[in-house]
Amino acid sequence: MAKMLKFSEEARRALERGVDAVADAVKITLGPKGRNVVIEKSWGSPTITNDGVSIAKEIELEDKFENLGAQLVKEVASKTNDVAGDGTTTATVLAQAMIKEGIKNVTAGANPILVKRGIEKAVAAGVEEIKKISKKLSSTNDIAHVASISANSEEIGKLIAEAMEKVGEDGVITVEDSKSIETYVEFTEGMQFDRGYVSPYFVTDPEKMEVVYNEPFILITDRKLSNIKPLIPILEKVAQTGKPLVIIAEDVEGEALTTLVLNKLKGTLNTVAVKAPGFGDRRKAMLQDIAILTGGIVASEEVGINLEDLTLNDLGRADVVRVKKDETIIVGGHGDQEEIKKRIAQIKAQIEQTTSEYEKETLQERMAKLAGGVAVIKVGAATETELKEKKHRIEDALSATRAAVEEGIVPGGGITLLRARKAVEKVVNELDGDEKIGAKIVYEALIAPINQIAKNAGYDGAIIIHKVLENDDPAYGFDALKGEYCNMFERGIIDPAKVTRSALQNAASIASMLLTTEALVVEKPEPKNNAPMPEMPEY
């Protein structure tokens, strides 16, 4: 395949045109008065969004050289989105500002490698300043503010705050379609897994077709139970206590199942048999989770624990166990809290190490079940287009809120990046030559987000910046929605520190790469075949 090449100045200018195409489409969405972008879809209704990464991902330019620049900006947006779940528009605006200023200086003769070094030093100082300004989330109100700003809706902010309050820091919150036009939160307390009773004869509430036992013993094993003999000793011990017994096993069949059903029907022993959740290694891990949560052990031949040798102390306990046809919920497990915390920490470590998205999701789900619950935000809307857009905003706001819990919050509205200039200015004064130019590029770029927010809201950015910097309070800023100067923390205009930090780091990373680019290589497009169709022969 033949290639086309461009070098030095010509190459950088082509990249810049590509960067501008994406950034100009994305930056109009920034701030409380940002506009929407309508994206055509090859099938289904068009998407209406103000999410930077969604817009960037859809842009593909005809000119192959310019398209390389567009792809680099997409990388900024998606990297920021992956790490922090928000801040994609801010990252794009910063990248565009750094690239514009950088290309100007490199064209004037600055050494790109030294410029890159200066950029890196300035960004490191900026990141440190962001960390200093940040403060921990102190209330549900703070969480609601972070979510409201990300989703651009107070109603969504309140829903996310409610969900987070219920499931805690390690809990799982999922987003699903609602069957009505209402948007609300559903909460499942305790550990829930999608396996139900082996036989409907175990049902205690025929109306709801479910089994409900209070204060039951829980026998956990990874074996298939078909013979009743190994179970007899422990069944007798449980029967003497008068408490119910929940058996979680790989499967229960044959003689074992018949005996358990007969005991239940006669009233000798209230019991229910449930299939173990998951498959393979995942099943073993989930059984171990249930054992730790309920304070029991897993009876497994692998570790030499036989069913015949089990005592009441080896069985798990819980306040309530509910079993339906396809789901089981264990509420109020009697496990040791320290052991549960250790298990959660272990799963957290696994999440950090894994690279597979699917693996990450299943581990987070397990962690949430141990931590005490799952919340589902059911999203409702009048049309499919509105539903897609609303769902997307909620998912974004969730990611931003988690980022805020992790690294704290900073004043929003571009104020934190503006304040970080003070630290960057020190670096500019310490450096000289082309490194100084690199640091100066970052210094100038840090005003781009607040400028754009002001512009989108119809204000003059220069006047706002001057007025904000007159006040030394790092939380003092400009509310673009109401057109007032205020304390950003008190007004609830806040961003997660992680989002602001990631936006700056990713923008600088791509800008540095682009400035040090000296050649572009792309594939030559195939010539279109314009030859006329041959005439059909006459017969």
Curated annotation (Swiss-Prot):
Organism listed in the record: Thermosipho africanus (strain TCF52B)
Protein task: Together with its co-chaperonin GroES, plays an essential role in assisting protein folding. The GroEL-GroES system forms a nano-cage that allows encapsulation of the non-native substrate proteins and provides a physical environment optimized to promote and accelerate protein folding.
Statement: the UniProt record of this protein carries the keyword Isomerase: yes
Keyword ATP-binding: yes
CDD domains with a match to the protein in the record: GroEL
GO BP: protein refolding
Molecular function via GO: ATP binding; ATP-dependent protein folding chaperone; isomerase activity; unfolded protein binding
Catalytic activity: ATP + H2O + a folded polypeptide = ADP + phosphate + an unfolded polypeptide
Record's protein name: Chaperonin GroEL
GO cellular component: cytoplasm
EC number: 5.6.1.7
Family annotation (HAMAP family): CH60
Pfam families named among the record's database cross-references: Cpn60_TCP1 (PF00118)
Subcellular location: Cytoplasm
Subunit structure: Forms a cylinder of 14 subunits composed of two heptameric rings stacked back-to-back. Interacts with the co-chaperonin GroES.
InterPro entries: Chaperonin_Cpn60_CS, Cpn60/GroEL, Cpn60/GroEL/TCP-1, GroEL-like_apical_dom_sf, GROEL-like_equatorial_sf, TCP-1-like_intermed_sf
Binding site for ATP: T29, L30, G31, P32, D86, G87, T88, T89, T90, G413, D479, A480, L481, D495
